[in-house]
Amino acid sequence: MDYLSIIRQPIEEDLNNFTKLFNSCFSHKDALLSEVLSYVQKRGGKHMRPMLLLLMAKNYGQITDVTQYSAVSLELLHTSSLIHDDVVDESDERRGQPSVNSSYNNKVAVLVGDYILSTVLLNVSFTYNQRIVEYLAELGRVLASGELLQLSNIKNQEIREDIYYEVIQKKTAALFEACAAIGALSANASDDAVAKAKEFGMNLGMMFQIRDDIFDYFDSKEIGKPTGNDMAEGKLTLPVIYALNNTDFEAMQTLAKKVKAGTINTDEIRMALTAYVDYVIQRTK
């Protein structure tokens, strides 16, 4: 039994109910919108974030309709942000499959992302919980600011760990934090419990993103990420930052210049950074 199946066991029925509710958001009478929504739905991931939310709710109490609508809202927000991010990053792939903007075009992708974002607002309204609504609204602001920070860093090419941590805190960890906290809130957990859930979610999200960035330097059909893709797009992740800041080798100095000039290729990236992956793995522990 794989690790995700083990994690799902305590919430199997609840997760099935979530999936039904989530999938119900991806239908529309308009032909084009229905087609694109179906495409997005079929490319869906493992729903790790809703699992975290449901597990937190069950840990502190019961999974209710408030929990389910919260989980759907957060997963929809995550989905819409990925569609918009692919447009901004000009990415042709998402999870090893053609992105929405690649399969259709940027205009369609932006509008479908907006439609899903509006569906977030509809679903979170069904929680009738002001704290959850406010938390989700603030999360949307944080995700957008994180994407802008990453764009700014791509332009400025500042090779600094603190900026990297701030980007992944806003773009990834904030969503894990929200899932953990809102899961606890939906179960009427105490303020102290919600604070602990937030901290757990934040740390889990940071670890998740650092490990995901490591995968960028290895071929993997399972995760659908080409080797060195982030660096080729100008995104300076932790393996790159550490390598560039902790060596005097001429080869690495040349690599740094190519990164800033945007002339790096994936073979050069892989060869130069393999030795530094162990350092990054240690930072997740």
Where are these regions (language model features)?
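All-alpha prenyltransferase/terpene-synthase fold signal
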Residues: 1-285
